């Protein structure tokens, strides 16, 4: 058992050393990511049928200072955690599962029932409907909800990084082209 614990600790340490950081100009927000290349599974997705995805925009509102959780995925785009709905799950279950897969953070499905839902149909695929639930929380334990406490393996090859970022800082670093947001997240930010 001791050997296993030591192996897990060393594995996490090695993965932490591979992490890169993006800081906002003020230094108050840090996004952690890796340059590891993902080998995404080729999903046989029919563009002929209607499909649904779901996710959560987790917004922390601490002393009138709003921060949002964003993850990095395909094409190094950053955005709210979301993904394809499986046939055996509800939209809320899908949203909760995707947050765990992309950030390691667990959100109870029952706490999402009263959340406002944002519906987005992307221009590139009119047969896809994305449901995002706005989830406001008063504070977050950044120590337990940080990349430092995750192995890359924990992210299920769905994410190459994540972080909490102040909405003002996010606006500044996207204008400076330090990071690039996906179209869904740009849409959501206009609704917050």
From Swiss-Prot:
Positions of short motif Nudix box: 83-104
What EC number(s) does the entry state? 3.6.1.-
Cofactor(s) this protein requires: Mg(2+); Mn(2+)
**What's any GO biological process attached to this entry?**
ATP biosynthetic process
Residues reported to bind Mg(2+): 98, 102, 158
Q: Which residues form a coiled coil?
A: none
- Cite the GO molecular-function annotations of the record: bis(5'-nucleosyl)-tetraphosphatase (asymmetrical) activity; metal ion binding
> Could you name the domain of life of the organism this protein comes from?
Viruses
Question: Which PROSITE patterns does the annotation name?
Answer: NUDIX (PS51462), NUDIX_BOX (PS00893)
What is the name attached to this protein's record? Answer: Putative hydrolase 414L
């Amino acid at each position: 058992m001791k050997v296993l614990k030591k192996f897990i600790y060393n594995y996490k340490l090695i993965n932490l050393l591979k992490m890169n950081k993006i800081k906002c100009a003020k230094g108050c927000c840090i996004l952690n990511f890796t340059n590891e290349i993902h080998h995404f599974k080729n999903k046989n997705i029919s563009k002929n049928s209607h499909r649904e995805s779901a996710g959560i925009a987790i917004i922390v509102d601490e002393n009138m200072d709003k921060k949002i959780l964003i993850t990095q995925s395909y094409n190094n785009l950053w955005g709210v955690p979301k993904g394809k709905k499986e046939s055996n799950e509800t939209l809320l279950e899908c949203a909760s599962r995707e947050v765990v897969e992309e950030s390691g953070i667990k959100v109870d499905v029952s706490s999402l029932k009263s959340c406002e839902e944002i519906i987005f149909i992307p221009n590139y695929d009119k047969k896809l409907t994305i449901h995002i639930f706005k989830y406001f929380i008063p504070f977050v334990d950044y120590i337990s909800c940080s990349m430092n406490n995750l192995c890359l393996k924990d992210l299920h090859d769905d994410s190459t990084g994540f972080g909490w970022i102040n909405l003002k800082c996010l606006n500044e670093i996207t204008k400076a082209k330090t990071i690039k947001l996906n179209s869904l997240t740009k849409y959501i930010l206009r609704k917050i």
